[in-house]
Amino acid sequence: MDTLKILKKRAWAVVIALLAALLFSQVAGVVQSSLSAVQTSRLILLDAGHGGSDPGAAGLDSMTVEKDLNLAIALKLQHYLQQAGYLVQMTRTQDEGLYGPDDANKKRADMAERKRLMEESGADLFVSIHQNSFPDPRYWGPQVFYRKGNEDGQQLADCVQKQLNAFTAPNNTREIKANDSYYILLNAPMPAAILVECGFITNSMESESLRSEAYQKKVAWGIYCGIEE
């Protein structure tokens, strides 16, 4: 008789445990669905600067050009964001300019097309990826710019700058900077827009790092973490 009671108690314990597990999985599913809904309701427009006939800044060696680094980092950032459930739109996904074969002024046509994409995307965030340059090769370090007077952009820039420093350049003393002249920022209609200079392509050590896929992943991850923050 005692053995029967013990078996019944064990059976009930198993039933209760199974019900609890089922309930937990259902609740977890609802929470996860809610989080995914929040994330996927946010659209991010990623802009890999330059491309095609516009190489952007050049490194100390002729093999290193800005447009290639911009695209490599932007594609990695796209992957991280999509894995997290964000909707992502790209201005370009390959080495091409945003202009037509008959456009006389390709740079002007390219910037006009980027402006159109920004206006029609309906994105919540805009992130433009670039590489910095300076005649003096001593200068280094990532820096994030935002449109002057754009508080949401300033907040996003601050978060991205902190995370970039943490993952790629702990000793970097550069701070976020307001800008009132960058065409791409001045014409961004979304609530928050930033331009990320990932590093100085004219600094030999930083340029070597930026060409490394492992370092590009760190840069992309730093930007992603700043967006998540």
Where do the PLM segments sit?
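Catalytic-site microenvironment of enzymes
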Residues: 1-229
